[in-house]
């Protein structure tokens, strides 16, 4: 007989951990199941991203309303959270550059969108001001987005985990969900523990926040689940700023004008290959150091485990960084790769109840800006699906 439990959450990435923390305010018993051996040392995809706290100017409210809303809310919530707990986070801002007239026209679109999304402080800057901020960046025009920042993702996930654990959340690491079912109107979960033993548990409510596995799990209870995913790998490189004069860089996020591209899995929005300062250990503390990330370069892959061996040559990054002309392929060394699941033909996040069991909530396609949006997503889940204790 399956053991009855309170709330079950599948997935110990940043979204799952934030949901656990948010629900711990009202729910008495919460179990989070994570198939990896741990959560706090960068074991999950959440730690393999650029570490940018996005401001929210890339997402229109017509086709991507959840991303538009949660990115702006999440940016503010992360800023408050990191300040409160003295986490490695700096509001370094972002400069979005245009290198030709067509891109310059798109800056107006993003400036208008920043107003619609209520992103504070966004403005055009002159070439003179751009030169004062980042002398080695070349562009005909630019936007300054001051609320964007950078954080060290693993440290943030660790803090959310510790807070949730202190609130009584039970984190079952090394425990994989291998089947889902519905019995008598209630969710039923088949789990395999780290020692190989298998068991069934019956939660009162289930939150599927399994990241790249979310759609596969949804199909276990709904063969006709309407969404499909493509696995997208993002590769990045790095260089050392100041290695020579052309590589001097003051640490502002530098982004190209976003593009919408046609791919085998549909239209995809991409923020492009950008420059982002990285955290290093400086005098025994995690601080912004001299390492600069260049990326990501996106490639569709077949396996969620295909992120170890570099797939992109340095020269391919240089093709996308004309706004930083002093950078050469020989300056670049491999950094890291990560996998995200993007929904085919659905540019927004998906957050909703299972069609056959309203006690199951699925979160799918939580790609960029998923990390930034995580605290806002968690609040939304609590307010919309857990109104009663």
Language-model segment annotations:
Residues 143-205, 209, 375:
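Helical element adjacent to the flavin cofactor pocket in flavoenzyme catalytic cores
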Residues 25-46:
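Glycine-rich FAD pyrophosphate-binding loop
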Residues 5-32:
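N-terminal Rossmann-like FAD-binding beta1-loop-alpha1 element of flavoenzymes
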């Amino acid at each position: 007989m399956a053991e009855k439990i309170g709330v079950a959450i599948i997935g110990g990435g940043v979204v799952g951990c934030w949901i656990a923390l948010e629900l711990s305010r009202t729910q008495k018993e919460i179990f989070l199941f994570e198939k990896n051996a741990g959560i706090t040392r960068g074991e999950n995809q959440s730690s393999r991203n650029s570490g940018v706290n996005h401001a929210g100017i890339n997402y229109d409210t017509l086709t991507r309303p959840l991303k538009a809303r949660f990115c702006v809310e999440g940016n503010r919530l992360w800023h408050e959270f990191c300040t409160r707990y003295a986490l490695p986070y700096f509001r370094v801002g972002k400069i979005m550059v245009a290198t030709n007239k067509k891109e310059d026209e798109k800056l107006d679109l993003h400036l208008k969108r920043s107003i619609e999304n209520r992103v504070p402080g966004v403005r055009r800057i002159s070439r003179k001001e751009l030169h004062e901020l980042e002398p080695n960046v070349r562009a005909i025009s630019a936007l300054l987005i001051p609320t964007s920042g950078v954080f060290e993702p693993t440290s943030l996930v660790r803090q959310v985990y510790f807070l949730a654990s202190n609130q009584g959340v039970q984190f079952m690491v090394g425990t994989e969900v291998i089947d889902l079912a519905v019995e008598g109107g209630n969710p039923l979960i088949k789990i395999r523990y780290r020692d190989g033993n298998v068991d069934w548990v019956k939660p009162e409510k289930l939150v599927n926040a399994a990241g790249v596995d979310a759609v596969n799990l949804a199909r276990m209870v709904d063969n006709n689940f309407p969404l499909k995913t493509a696995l997208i790998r993002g590769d990045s490189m790095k260089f050392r700023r100041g290695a020579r004069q052309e590589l001097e860089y003051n640490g502002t996020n530098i982004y190209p004008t976003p593009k919408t591209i046609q791919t085998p899995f549909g239209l995809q929005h991409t923020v492009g290959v950008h420059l982002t300062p990285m955290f290093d250990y400086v005098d025994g503390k995690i601080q912004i150091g001299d390492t600069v990330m260049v990326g990501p370069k996106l490639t569709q892959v077949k396996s969620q485990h295909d992120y170890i061996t570099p797939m992109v040559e340095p020269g391919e990054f240089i093709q996308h960084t004309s706004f930083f002309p002093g950078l050469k392929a020989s300056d670049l060394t491999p950094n890291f790769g990560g996998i995200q699941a993007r929904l085919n033909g659905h540019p927004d996040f998906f957050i909703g109840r299972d069609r056959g069991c309203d006690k199951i909530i699925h979160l799918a396609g939580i790609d960029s800006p998923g990390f930034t949006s995580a605290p806002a997503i968690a609040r939304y889940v609590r307010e919309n699906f857990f109104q009663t204790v």
